[in-house]
Amino acid sequence: MMPSQITRSSHSSLPEVAPASGDATGVSEQTPQQARTVAFFSSGELAVAFGRTSAAPEQDSVRLLSALQRELDKQHPSWHTVAQLCQSLAEVGTTEQGWHQLASEDQLPALRELLDRCTHRLADMPAAHASHDSLSQACEGLRTARLHQSVARLTARPSSLARAMADLLTLTHLDPETLGAEPPVISSYTLFSHFVRTAKQRTADLNDSLQRQPDAVVSLLRSHADTLNDLEMLPGALQALTENCQDAPARNELRELAEVAGALLQLLLEHDLLPRLEEISIEPGEAPAPGHEPAEPRLTTRQALLKVGGNLVRKFDAYGALAPMDDKALLALMRTPAPHLSPDQMHAFLNKHVLHLTQEQRDIVSNTPLPFAPEEDIEARYGMGFDEKLRLALANGSLVLSEEQLARLGDLPSAATTTSDVVQTLLEKPSSALSEAERDMLGAIVQANAQGQLDAWRAHNEQLPAVLSRSGLPSDVKDELLSLNKSMNAELGTLKNGASLKSRVLASPAMLLALAPLPLAVAFVSKDNSYSSSLVAHFTKNAVFMAGLMMNELTNARTNVDHGLNRYFVTVLANAIVAQPTFARNEHLLEQVGFGIATAVASGAATLGVFNRESIVAAFKLAKSKLSRQDTGNARIPQEDHLAVVKHFDVSEHFAQQMKVATELYKQDKSITDIMNSSLTYLGTKSSEFQARFEVADALRAGLQLAEGERKADPDFYTKLGLVALTASIGAALVMLMKSMVGKADYAADGVWCVSEMLKLAMNPEVDMQKAVQVFKEIVGLNLVMTGFLGVNKVWNFLDKGIKGYASGAAVLTAANLTLPGMVGEVAGAAAGKGLSYLTDKGKAAHQAGRAAASWAGDYVSTSRLGSAVGTLQTAIPGRIAGGQVVAGLYDRFRYLTWSHPAPAPQAAGEP
């Protein structure tokens, strides 16, 4: 289909249209509908048919919706006020700015909810009621605003299928008698005929798509079901337009459109997008009245149960033992060979998706020659070059885009970096709120960031030895960087090829069989029913995790080590310490305070040492470097070599950021296992360490002062910090509920360790909420369930009431441990995070007020005798004011910020 030459209501440019093209007398005698119809025939612009103008709105739609919501929430609303607000909202929808405001995702559910509320109130209100007319006017205003909203969203979509519905709705809102008017009111049918012909072609395409791919099209149209009710008037409107049309070609186009539209109405009825079959006739002249209730999306009982069940299983079984996960699709995309995309090329890749280039246009771009790329230009040599070809083809005139494509190209926000607006917008929306166009954009961004990344990143990492040979760095730093590089390549290899069958099948069963007996034996010999029931629940969950580990192809040695430490180490260590006195029946020793303290200290120290081994090793290295002369490497290397080395590490960080944004956006609409998420988190963390280690070493080599890098913003910081607070409270409560001294000491050490681990996750911006909840489930989950369980048992003591009571209690505890930790962790973390975020926002407001007061005081001081003294103090402490700004803005609303490359302080000596 040829691109339409009639300008649609795109976001880039909207026409300014006069109410009518006739003289002043004619205008004064026209109704608003006639004026809109005349303007539409004169311009051929869809938006004009709905009365849209370029005038600025007198009010803001967001404030109007809020005011309307508050008024309706009152016990006795003022229906006169409601009617005025609704009328104002309808008027805002006729302006260009208001048109776009109503089309936003935030206002879509709000407007529909208000319309439903008013419609139901009107249906319940007697016609003789004093407020009936006001409420009726309110409903009419809301329906008008809803119409503008729906048409704006339909025309904003790149798909011609959605625009077909907007074209047909336009024809139902014209005045047919205006076509029979004498010139000069209607001087030409050219634009009108072209509009009808385009609508016919789009409607035919929509019919074909409804027959071939009904699910996708129905999903696209379902949110507009209430507005589509106006199509019930379409047969009568087309008949009236045909009868009044004075142009023979235009009449033929209208008749052909009526046939295609009739088939469309039947298809819409079959898919429940129109409410009642008996009131829709495709015969000319039979136009049923509008006003039916909107058709809401419906799922069958079976579909609803399957959807709810799938979500619950995913929550309970994030390792993927039973739950259907979407790892395969993301892995397949990452494993697909494709060139690495630079930021500019990624933007162009998205252009290609959003512009919907025809095959002829793609061939033109593909055949456009590129200038010669130097060998050292990694991006130009290994990138796909679509961006450069697209620009060159447009510049030399070989590629001609339609008006719609140009509008999309101008409106497309850059998605080349993780901080781009389009990425942030998609990340901040829940999956259910994503529009069809946003889902298309999401898929394109995931593909651009993920496709071919595994091969490209590994190939890039293989160049590191050659790069380091030009770096001038000392040998110990090179070894450390090579070790980090090896760790990343090993993880990339697992993602590319999967883990060995041996590591998947043998490791987790061996851990369960070898490590579970000792704690269980200690618990049963000591006859501590509370403790033994908790271990039954703990190891049952380990068995479920074991199934997930064995079935997941990404279960490598690192995954098994993490699983063993998180699920076995603390339990086995604590029971190993108390095993000898337990089996020897030395109750006196077990109840001594000193033994309990010694057990807690030994267990806690060993646990913290094992889980913080890397930090401890790094601290020893730092201390050693401080005590001895440190080799900083060659301070003077060629500038060309230095630039090549810096380029290599920057590209490495770019790979990590691409992988992260692909994963985050993919998870907006899909589910991946905790195992895959852990693998990707590990890569991100190691990449950050890799980059940071190089920056420090390079600055020391050159004898420069390392500038403070910008901290990556962490959108999950407050929710993760909420999990830390929850972990601490659970540990304290559990210690209070334990009866024996050993139990108190054991859970005290366990609580300190859990808090330290959750705090490390909270402070790491590479760790997202899914990873934090995964660790919470593994190390705190049982403690969470035990707290409530032992609290109930403290009242009824059912665990000590025979085998039946013990078995029932253990079964309940096991079931709770399998299901609750993940959900409770997410909910509690989110709630605590909101509270912390609120307190921080209040703190920022107080900080701003304090700064304003300080500024006023500073103005006063600067004019007083103290001015010179204050100036001297500020000179002595140059970072005082800037430091406050850094603290206030440490965690803001931005999603991800890349580590800034250090800007070395200028020094004369040591320049490379």
From Swiss-Prot:
Any one Gene Ontology cellular component term annotated for this protein: extracellular region
* Name this polypeptide is given: Effector protein hopAE1
Keyword annotations for this protein, in alphabetical order, are:
Secreted
Where is this chain's protein located in or outside the cell? Secreted
Q: Where is the composition biased (Polar residues)?
A: 1-13
Superkingdom: Bacteria
Q: Does the keyword Kinase apply?
A: no
**Family listed:** Belongs to the HopW family.
Q: Record's InterPro entries? A: T3SS_HopW1-1/HolPsyAE
Stretches for region Disordered: 1-32
Q: Does the keyword Secreted apply?
A: yes
